[in-house]
């Protein structure tokens, strides 16, 4: 069966997310480029780039959408016990470029979509104040983290990595605690998987997700939320 997709041109506009295909789930458009302005415009509409080696740039808006409620996130007893023992240091926006690079390099070439061009775009978005990271440290070595895009009171998670057990889980835990105390309302995780489900992610159908996005994207998060800082004290 033929698939008809919109090819993006020079304009940074996108089709409506409601035009996304059901199979493959959420595929909306192809082409264009990875200009940071285009990427940011996509996030403001619930659209993100994701494609593999040898593929054109593909743009997605899947349904259902995997999300976390930062206010409702509850770390497991075992994770709390682990962190009390290890006392990993956790920071915000202290090494965003390195986190982005490690999210790519810790995966095989076949597994990662985060190629050099994509990394360059997200690093530029970080320089502009739109892309943020959480870092987990052990003995001054970066052992885990995550990064994503802030859109008002919505945080769009992009990728995470772990070099030691539980490091990415701890990054997510501290991110949720930090957002919950600074008017962050929702974390978008794009597509559900068993790992996200085990951490408490739940799904929203497209209508519900888009309505939340529209209500949150123009709301201000607390001033200073994404200033570089240590988050270790944010978790009791």
Curated annotation (Swiss-Prot):
<comment type="similarity">
    <text>Belongs to the L/F-transferase family.</text>
</comment>
<dbReference type="GO" id="GO:0030163">
    <property type="term" value="P:protein catabolic process"/>
</dbReference>
<dbReference type="Pfam" id="PF03588">
    <property type="entry name" value="Leu_Phe_trans"/>
</dbReference>
<keyword id="KW-0012">Acyltransferase</keyword>
<dbReference type="InterPro" id="IPR042221">
    <property type="entry name" value="Leu/Phe-tRNA_Trfase_N"/>
</dbReference>
<dbReference type="GO" id="GO:0008914">
    <property type="term" value="F:leucyl-tRNA--protein transferase activity"/>
</dbReference>
<comment type="function">
    <text>Functions in the N-end rule pathway of protein degradation where it conjugates Leu, Phe and, less efficiently, Met from aminoacyl-tRNAs to the N-termini of proteins containing an N-terminal arginine or lysine.</text>
</comment>
<keyword id="KW-0963">Cytoplasm</keyword>
<dbReference type="InterPro" id="IPR016181">
    <property type="entry name" value="Acyl_CoA_acyltransferase"/>
</dbReference>
<protein>
    <recommendedName>
        <fullName>Leucyl/phenylalanyl-tRNA--protein transferase</fullName>
        <ecNumber>2.3.2.6</ecNumber>
    </recommendedName>
</protein>
<keyword id="KW-0808">Transferase</keyword>
<dbReference type="InterPro" id="IPR004616">
    <property type="entry name" value="Leu/Phe-tRNA_Trfase"/>
</dbReference>
<dbReference type="GO" id="GO:0005737">
    <property type="term" value="C:cytoplasm"/>
</dbReference>
<dbReference type="InterPro" id="IPR042203">
    <property type="entry name" value="Leu/Phe-tRNA_Trfase_C"/>
</dbReference>
